[in-house]
Amino acid sequence: MSNETNCTLDFEQSVELFKEYNLFITAFLLFLTIILQYGYATRSKFIYILKMIVLWCFWPLNIAVGVISCIYPPNTGGLVAAIILTVFACLSFVGYWIQSIRLFKRCRSWWSFNPESNAVGSILLTNGQQCNFAIESVPTVLSPIIKNGFLYCEGQWLAKCEPDHLPKDIFVCTPDRRNIYRMVQKYTGDQSGNKKRFATFVYAKQSVDTGELESVATGGSSLYT
């Protein structure tokens, strides 16, 4: 007699297993749906951070499953496919960390490790505060606004701010470039004429270099003139 045990599930066992864990599966899928659908920095920072954590977990999970597939391949063809996919997952994960670390060295912001983007916007206020925000791509124009004394850019709340705190230049950093935006227009005041209550600023892309924000912050007061 064979001592091997058949570990495969038949249809009825699969149905029973689903019935037993269907509540957990429903809750898990609902959690993923909410995270992926509503996880935007402009809506809720908390849900957005949860979304980032979920995305971070996907790469190690893919690598782990790939390694298991290499250890227990269904056949020779499956082994080759598992090796290729696992190597691709490992290279992609390493590439993500390399690019994120390069971006972090350039702008010193934890947004550098955002798996959705390889760009970070930075506004160095004249009061010494640095405001960083997530941005999906390098735009041609940036339009930060001040509403009720709070600074917003790309729909994201950044800091408590007054109109005269905005600098002449703001930046969007990528792993290999620093994009410089210069203020070209400024509108202050609301319908009541209160210039501190509402303000709109227009920054146009001026130049591109390979500098870091730290060199700008310590380079003198010319940035704020």
From Swiss-Prot:
CDD domains: gammaCoV_M. Changing residue 34 to M: In strain: Isolate GA/5381/99. Belongs to the gammacoronaviruses M protein family. Residues 42-51, 99-225 are intravirion. HAMAP family: GAMMA_CORONA_M (MF_04203). Changing residue 44 to I: In strain: Isolate AR/6386/97. Changing residue 108 to K: In strain: Isolate IL/2831/98. One of its GO terms (cellular component) is virion membrane. The gene is M. This is Membrane protein. Pfam families: CoV_M. Changing residue 112 to A: In strain: Isolate MN/6370/97. Residues 1-20, 73-77 are virion surface. Disulfide bonds: none annotated. Homomultimer. Interacts with envelope E protein in the budding compartment of the host cell, which is located between endoplasmic reticulum and the Golgi complex. Forms a complex with HE and S proteins. Interacts with nucleocapsid N protein. This interaction probably participates in RNA packaging into the virus.
